[in-house]
Amino acid sequence: MPAINVGIIGVSGYTGFELIRLLLAHPNFKMSYLAASSEAKIDEIFPSLRGVLDLDVHRADAKEAAKRCEVVFLALPHQEAMRYAKQLLSLGVKVVDLSADYRLSRELYEKNYCEHLDVQNLARAVYGLVELNRERIKGANLVANPGCYPTASILAVLPFLKFIDLDFGVVIDAKSGVSGAGKKLSASSHFVSVNENANAYNPINHRHADEIKFHLSNAAGSDISTLFVPHLLPITRGMLVSAYARLVKDIKPLEVLGEFYKNERFIRVRDEAVQIKNVAGTHFCDITAFAHEGKIFINSAIDNLLRGASSQAIANANLMCGLDENLALPMISQFC
């Protein structure tokens, strides 16, 4: 089949780089447009791409992107992404948005972020967690790529929704590498702040809390109480979730996981506690769970930049274009 032309707007960040790395290995997608807030050569932004990719990075322009591309990945901050998405969609381009702009209801979005400027497309967007919405993604023109914490948390809890006390809810203790804070420098991401340190941040009030609750409640068909606390670890990449809930019936957790995810290529059910090392650099989500005295512990691990962002975006684009969803998804971990 002929190559499908794709573009990235917001290419200069970590997720932009990961998209490039994956697209270079994609058999059907051809990078035809790269854009950021200013013009440059791609190897000036990422010197590791010298001799690998010779493309100019343009100042972002939706009309120019639409001329060159059938699919555009938006790796932009919230609010900025929706401005481009609205234009691209009106020009017939499929959009995978890695920001938060289309993940929530209008009410929850405006509670956590800002006024929504594209309510019409917000109502049409499909939440791009493949294991949850595979068939809907196939027919979508706009996919909202899930956040990293919600990806790891929802995939962990989803199989157990009919077995846990929804009123008591679920407590989610999540930990991320520093790359989750993005490329822009802040006081909390300085080496001296992160090294030999670990801390909770934005406990209870993190923006991803409502994304997790919203999509778990939709999946359960009933409101579920959630308590979400993220932590920062002194590692570059990776994410670990520990979730706790009260059971309403006796189950064998590994059997539940195995049955629920039996057809999912990139979900690995483990019989021991999961490790970031085994998933870093891959699209895999490793999950395990243990029951004890009427309670359950669920443990998941992902790569926050890949399964939590860029490789998930590739999987969504694959489905949107009628391709094998697993094309170009990384499988070998960066173990050392």
Swiss-Prot record:
Against Gene3D superfamilies, the record matches this protein to: Dihydrodipicolinate Reductase, domain 2, NAD(P)-binding Rossmann-like Domain
Q: Which reaction does it catalyse?
A: N-acetyl-L-glutamate 5-semialdehyde + phosphate + NADP(+) = N-acetyl-L-glutamyl 5-phosphate + NADPH + H(+)
The record's GO CC annotations read:
cytoplasm
Asked if the keyword Transit peptide belongs to this entry, the reply reads no
Note the InterPro entries from the entry. AGPR_AS, AGPR_type-1, NAD(P)-bd_dom_sf, NAGSA_dehydrogenase, Semialdehyde_DH_NAD-bd
Gene Ontology BP, a term: L-arginine biosynthetic process
Coiled-coil intervals in this record?
none
**What EC class does the entry list?**
oxidoreductase
Q: Where is the active site?
A: 148
Give the GO molecular function terms. N-acetyl-gamma-glutamyl-phosphate reductase activity; NAD binding; NADP+ binding
Q: Does the keyword Metal-binding apply?
A: no
Keyword list (alphabetical) reads:
Amino-acid biosynthesis, Arginine biosynthesis, Cytoplasm, NADP, Oxidoreductase
Cellular location of this protein?
Answer: Cytoplasm
Which Pfam families does the record associate with it?
Answer: Semialdhyde_dh, Semialdhyde_dhC_1
The EC number(s) attached to this protein equal 1.2.1.38
Q: In which pathway does it act?
A: Amino-acid biosynthesis; L-arginine biosynthesis; N(2)-acetyl-L-ornithine from L-glutamate: step 3/4
The role this protein plays is: Catalyzes the NADPH-dependent reduction of N-acetyl-5-glutamyl phosphate to yield N-acetyl-L-glutamate 5-semialdehyde.
Q: Which family does it belong to?
A: Belongs to the NAGSA dehydrogenase family. Type 1 subfamily.
Q: Which PANTHER family match?
A: N-ACETYL-GAMMA-GLUTAMYL-PHOSPHATE REDUCTASE, CHLOROPLASTIC-RELATED, N-ACETYL-GAMMA-GLUTAMYL-PHOSPHATE REDUCTASE, CHLOROPLASTIC-RELATED-RELATED
Descriptive protein name? N-acetyl-gamma-glutamyl-phosphate reductase
- Look up and give the organism this protein is from: Campylobacter curvus (strain 525.92)
Designated gene of the protein: argC
